[in-house]
Amino acid sequence: MSSIVDDGISFRPLDIDDFDKGYSECLQQLTEAKFTKEQFIERFNQIKKQSDTYFLIVAVDVKLNKIIACGSLFVEKKFIRNCGKCGHIEDIVVNNNYRGKNLGLRIIEQLKCIGSQAGCYKIILDCSEANVKFYEKCKFERKGVQMSIYLPTPPKL
């Protein structure tokens, strides 16, 4: 995916230098996302080694050189559907100061395109009830019920 610049906003893959451009701060508007630069670099390098599985996109305010939105696609390799692939969209967030500019929609559209190019037979996501209308605008439909269990944090070795 090449960088797309529109209205002073660039859309591109996550880069190793993005910790210093506010990636953590952007994610924190979605959920708890505190991590050190060292943790970011370690995880970034792990993800980079699986470039056919993980696709992380950021939107950058070019003037401020600051990340203002992000999202990710994880491609799950399955045995069902003739050893098909299922895309999972995760961690869609737009900085509060930039909402209403269709940035989330544009990130979703790019992730859907990546999923299609990766050969996914479907793309799924989980969202809160408050975000259903947004994802319907992105052409997603309600399907099934989400279930989850949060596990305790394992002790550090």
Swiss-Prot record:
It is an enzyme of class 2 (transferase). Acetyl-CoA binds at residues 100-105, 135-137. One of its GO terms (molecular function) is glucosamine 6-phosphate N-acetyltransferase activity. GO terms for biological process: UDP-N-acetylglucosamine biosynthetic process. Keywords: Acyltransferase, Transferase. Its EC number is 2.3.1.4. Residues 9-157 form the N-acetyltransferase domain. Coiled coil: none annotated. It catalyses: D-glucosamine 6-phosphate + acetyl-CoA = N-acetyl-D-glucosamine 6-phosphate + CoA + H(+). It comes from the Eukaryota. Substrate binds at residues 31, 78-81, 90-92, 121-122. Pathway: Nucleotide-sugar biosynthesis; UDP-N-acetyl-alpha-D-glucosamine biosynthesis; N-acetyl-alpha-D-glucosamine 1-phosphate from alpha-D-glucosamine 6-phosphate (route I): step 1/2. Belongs to the acetyltransferase family. GNA1 subfamily. PANTHER family: GLUCOSAMINE 6-PHOSPHATE N-ACETYLTRANSFERASE. This is Glucosamine 6-phosphate N-acetyltransferase 1. The lineage of its organism: Eukaryota, Amoebozoa, Evosea, Eumycetozoa, Dictyostelia.
